[in-house]
UniProtKB/Swiss-Prot annotation:
Pfam families: DNA_mis_repair, HATPase_c_3, MutL_C
Species this protein is from: Rhizobium etli (strain CIAT 652)
Alphabetical list of InterPro entries matching this protein: DNA_mismatch_repair_CS, DNA_mismatch_repair_MutL, DNA_mismatch_S5_2-like, HATPase_C_sf, MutL/Mlh/PMS, MutL/Mlh/Pms-like, MutL_C, MutL_C_dimsub
Recorded superkingdom: Bacteria
Xref: PANTHER family: DNA MISMATCH REPAIR PROTEIN MLH, PMS, MUTL (PTHR10073), DNA MISMATCH REPAIR PROTEIN MLH1 (PTHR10073:SF12)
Record key words, sorted: DNA damage, DNA repair
Entry GO CC: mismatch repair complex
Gene3D superfamilies linked to this entry: 3.30.230.10, Histidine kinase-like ATPase, C-terminal domain (3.30.565.10), MutL, C-terminal domain, dimerisation subdomain (3.30.1540.20), MutL, C-terminal domain, regulatory subdomain (3.30.1370.100)
Region annotated Disordered, chain positions: 348-378
Name listed for the protein in its UniProt record: DNA mismatch repair protein MutL
Keyword 4Fe-4S: no
Length: 606
């Protein structure tokens, strides 16, 4: 068969298969054109999920009649001329409008601000129907009807109208985040009107519009520069996380991207603070010289290629970790909100257990005896971590049953987490702050403190160990024993000394001194499982912090152990100065805060 030149219409339809995958793809291209034209107001209207109608109106610079005719021709553009090295616009290929016109009925009406009148062009299935004068306001209105009517096979691959409308909404949200100075309005027969008023340079206000006030309340500012590459944006505290990565937004020179390198860097930055299967919420904006990034590697321009990907990844990971450390004692505000909803009239819990009748024996005001298996003696590991200065300043609270003195402004206002007032169910510390109260999960909080202390020691020197008077003997499968012994030298750096004790057994002779009393059996078994899962032949050097987190969990104050008042206060003081203390090593919150105004509202006093 002879080789022949394809028709212009067929060429455009082939290009449309790459550029215009669905109605949301067309919406993205048209919104980008409006932004490149300098629009400050963009309105999007849809019907039938964008298949029946997609209209994008803007107040941008507009076009003359000659520009309209060129705009629907392939590879005609005003945005680049001779090189791809300095792309500063969202669009640049000149493919979007001819691709849309080849598979749909396209109508464009436009008028320049300095023109007395406007013009319109109509295209159907790749053929120009007419070009004529038309009444138009300054700016451009692009109307797409019957998308894919010229290639009906493509319609079979589209999702439901609701799903397609949702994809368009997501595109508008991403554009709204990237351009807070632009007003966006999305309306149509298949949705309620969505409006994002312009917020100027107030990016956080736009985040609140798009992502909700909860994100604004749980966001940490990012602002970092490395070798002329700048990173700005907001990262959510670790306890403010989601079940998928859909709430991670990345922009490169203002262009929304879904780049694997950036998403991987976000995961890496939160690796030690978020539970498996949960995802952080983040909005990142990277600004760099256009010559240092290639945006022409994907038909939809959703992926980019950095000249120095390692530098970009390091910038993202470092900036997020530094921000989390700087503001690390914060926990998400959502926990308190959920708890408050439980007290409001009409709230129905998922499962309500019958309550036992009240009696003096079960009264919550009765002093708790020591929990089974625990003594009243403080745990050694806690004393080693407590700050001497904090312990010297704080006076012990009265014994149970004694009158409780009123908290002074000096006591509650001096410390963000307040002063300990009680311990409930031998697990939760209740502290009074200047404007409310804080409830702390003692095990989760102490686990984080131990981990941070171990991590700090790891970076400075070998961890001190304590010799066990009687070694702990743990029976394990032979393969687990072999794996552990392969990494015995590295575990000794963490203060854990082990050796073989015959076939199928490990002897633990030393444990990290800062952990105090350790559940050696549980620790060794979990380490064996983790090493088997990692299956690392190159050693544990890259995983030592994960091992430290496991040790911290097994060496922390346990749930069910009573703490003395000075121990509780020392724990609060240590949390205030420890990075990341707002969440445990598994990403769960270590405390929740209730403002006095919220409590008063529950009792109708607001």
């Amino acid at each position: 068969m002879a080789i022949r030149q394809l028709s212009e219409t067929l060429i455009n339809q082939i290009a449309a298969g790459e550029v215009i995958e669905r109605p949301a793809s067309a919406a993205k291209e048209l919104i980008e054109n409006a932004l490149d034209a300098g629009a400050t107001r963009i309105e999007i209207a849809t019907a039938g999920g964008g298949k029946a109608l997609l209209r994008v109106s803007d107040n941008g610079s507009g076009m003359e009649a000659t520009d309209l005719e060129l705009a629907v021709r392939r590879h005609c553009t005003s945005k680049i001329s001779e090189t791809l090295e300095d792309i500063r616009t969202l669009g640049f290929r000149g493919e979007a409008l001819p691709s849309i016109g080849s598979v749909a009925r396209l109508n464009i009406a436009s008028r320049r601000r300095d023109s007395a009148g406007g013009h319109e062009i109509a295209v159907a299935g790749g053929k120009i129907v007419h070009i004529r004068p038309a009444a138009a306001n300054p700016g451009t209105i692009v109307e797409v009807r019957d998308l894919f009517f010229a290639t009906p096979a493509r319609l079979k691959f589209l999702k439901s109208e609701k799903a397609e409308a949702g994809a368009i909404t997501e595109i508008v949200k991403r554009m709204a985040i990237a351009f807070p100075a632009v007003r966006f309005v999305l309306s149509g027969s298949d949705r309620t009107t969505l409006e994002f008023p312009a917020t100027g340079d107030d990016h956080l206000a736009r985040m609140a519009q798009v992502l909700g006030k909860e994100f604004r309340d749980n966001a940490i500012l990012l602002d970092a520069v490395r070798e002329d590459i700048s990173l700005t944006g907001f990262a959510g505290v670790p306890t403010f996380n989601r079940g998928n990565s859909a709430h991670q937004y990345a922009f490169v020179n203002g262009r929304p991207v879904q780049d694997k390198l950036i998403l991987s860097a976000i995961r890496g930055a939160y690796a030690e603070t978020i539970p498996s299967g949960r995802y952080p919420v983040a909005v990142l904006s990277i600004t760099l010289d256009p010559a240092l990034v290639d945006v022409n590697v994907h038909p939809a321009k959703s992926d980019v290629r950095f000249r120095d990907p390692g530098l970009v990844r390091g910038l993202i990971v470092g900036a997020i970790r530094e921000a989390l450390a700087r503001d690390g004692s914060r926990a998400a505000t959502t926990g308190a909100s959920d708890m408050l909803r439980a007290f409001r009239p009409g709230f129905q819990p998922h499962a309500q257990r019958p309550q036992a009748p009240w009696s003096a024996e079960t009264s919550p005001f009765r002093p708790y005896p020591p929990a089974a298996g625990f003594s009243e003696r403080p745990q050694a590991s806690f004393d080693r971590l407590s700050m001497p200065t904090a312990r010297a300043e704080l006076q012990p609270s009265p014994q149970p049953g004694a009158p409780e003195p009123a908290a002074s402004a000096e006591t509650t206002g001096r410390y963000p987490l307040g002063a300990a007032r009680a311990q409930i169910h031998a697990n939760y510390i209740v502290a009074q702050t200047e404007d409310g109260l804080v409830i702390v999960d003692q095990h989760a909080a102490h686990e984080r403190l131990v981990f941070e202390a171990m991590r700090k020691a790891l970076h400075s020197k070998r961890l001190a160990s304590q010799v066990l008077l009687i070694p702990e003997i743990i029976d394990l499968p032979e393969e687990d024993c072999d794996r552990l012994m392969q990494h015995a030298a590295e575990l000794s750096e963490l203060g854990l000394a082990i050796e073989r004790f015959g076939p199928g057994a490990i002897a633990v002779r030393e444990t990290p001194a800062m952990l105090g009393e350790v559940d050696a059996h549980g620790l060794i078994r979990q380490l064996a499982d983790e090493i088997a899962e990692w299956d690392t032949a190159s050693g544990l050097s890259a995983k030592l912090e994960y091992v430290a987190a496991t040790m911290a969990c097994h060496g922390s104050v346990r749930s069910g152990r009573r703490l003395r008042p000075e121990e509780m206060n020392a724990l609060l003081r240590e949390m205030e100065v420890t990075p990341g203390s707002g969440q445990c090593n598994h990403g769960r919150p270590t405390y929740i805060e209730l403002k006095l105004s919220d409590i008063e509202r529950l009792f109708g006093r607001s």
